[in-house]
Design a protein with these regions (language model features):
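Glycine/proline-enriched, intrinsically flexible loops and inter-domain linkers
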Residues: 1-309
Length: 309
């Protein structure tokens, strides 16, 4: 079962909870040289996927690696599917079209029935997601028997994905860009307000020490939202795009502020929201935080309306 209002106290200081969820992995990935041959246009950490140009053309390739082990632990099928879906969402967020995946399946001892179940269901979820997105699996490997003291790791079906941008002039980063740009939440008509939507979230695990509930999945909505982001990017309508994933909406917004070195003013009235922590920290899928120049906001909204977003 998922969390209930009785399980969780209202956050005393959402700002402190936000700081508890923000991390800085830069000390790891910045040890590596991303500029070999001077082809990197969006470095790791600057966008939801890295982007490299293809010299002599207008095209570029986008690369990302994704998985949420907690989601896979709670629901191996949905978690496996979401690993593919989130990778595609991240590829789309830089303006690229997903092309293919590779995978690395990391699990415990498959001789244990529960691990065999996790492995089978995660693969089934990944396969269904690949069929939905029409993506081939071009390579992969498996790492099993990952245990210590008879305790298996969380199921971790890691997905690497490559995508293509036809015109690298339309690439997008995750950071907010210009003062006065407008911020949109794409993929939903309302903010999360039900405490049960916190099920399977990083917030529930890291702040409250609870692991329950389960991740959600909507193939049709994901495909529609991702296509819209790619269309808007190709028309040059988007300044930045960052998907809502681990940590929820407020973490995605904060990360866009940090990456872009610019603040954000949010004027949404939350006084009547059912659950403030669900609004801020729920990880409902198919949501993307987008910033758009004021001069382009009407065209962006018109495209969203025509795309039934």
């Amino acid at each position: 079962p998922g969390p209930s209002a009785e399980d969780l106290e209202a956050p005393d200081d959402p700002g402190e909870d936000l700081l508890g969820l923000l991390t800085d992995p830069a000390w790891v990935y910045r040890q590596y040289d991303h500029q070999v041959l001077n082809n990197t246009l969006v470095a790791p950490g600057a966008g939801d996927a890295a982007v490299m140009r293809i010299k002599g053309t207008t095209k570029g390739i986008a690369l990302t690696v994704d998985v949420n082990p907690l989601a896979c632990y709670l629901d191996p099928y949905v978690g496996g599917a979401l690993a593919v879906i989130e990778a595609a969402r991240n590829i789309s967020c830089v303006g690229a079209t997903p092309l293919a995946i590779t995978d690395c399946l990391n699990f415990g001892n498959p001789e244990r029935p529960e691990v065999a179940y996790q492995l089978t269901e995660a693969i089934r979820g990944m396969a269904d997601a690949c069929r939905e997105l029409e993506l081939p699996v071009i390579s992969g490997n498996v790492s099993l028997y990952n245990e210590s003291q008879d305790t298996a790791i969380y199921p971790t079906p890691t997905v690497g994905m490559v995508g293509l941008i036809d015109n690298v002039d339309h690439k997008i980063g995750s950071g907010f860009v210009g003062e006065g740009d407008q911020i949109f939440l794409v993929g939903t008509e309302s903010l999360e307000s039900d405490v049960t939507s916190l099920g399977g979230s990083t917030y529930l695990s890291a702040i409250h020490g609870k692991i329950n509930g389960g991740p959600r999945l909507d193939f049709a909505l994901e495909k529609k939202v991702q296509k819209f982001i790619r269309d808007a990017s190709s028309k040059g309508l988007i300044s930045s795009a960052h998907d809502v994933s681990e940590g929820g909406l407020i973490v995605a917004i904060a990360e866009s502020c940090v990456i872009g070195d610019i603040g954000a003013a949010l004027n949404e009235d939350l006084s009547e929201i059912g659950s403030l922590d669900a609004c801020l920290f729920a990880e409902a899928p198919a949501r993307i935080v987008v910033s758009v120049s004021k001069t382009l906001s009407n065209e962006f909204e018109s495209l969203a309306l025509n795309s039934q977003i």
